[in-house]
């Protein structure tokens, strides 16, 4: 078996309609041909994108990219787990409640949480403190905002509905989130 991962799939499989210069059409055509030819082999193709609206619909037909997963931002428990990993080894003051930070970071991505932890560390350094306090995190929360806004969340929901209507529902293995 072989797993082929295409990160930023939208740059390789851009919709012919949205590719004004048609530069990617040759790449897209070749990818589609190769994916058709490998249908019976042990090759799994994974495409990753944060711009699903740019991917050509032909990539979403049976035998190509059969399963579409929309990865939601981390929930509160996941944010807590991420924060614990990010702060492991950081000199945290005794007054820090990581649960409170997880609660107050709704719509933060893992990258947003990493920025928050770095910001809290910088705040502690600016105070010449050896420990990162809850106030350092509170200041960080004012500076580091979540990258997923209501508008972005709605946009992804709309795209999810659009993409879900393209993929044939006949395959029992196809699922959506």
Residue map of PLM features:
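C-terminal engagement/docking regions of AAA+ P-loop ATPases
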Residues: 97-117, 125-177
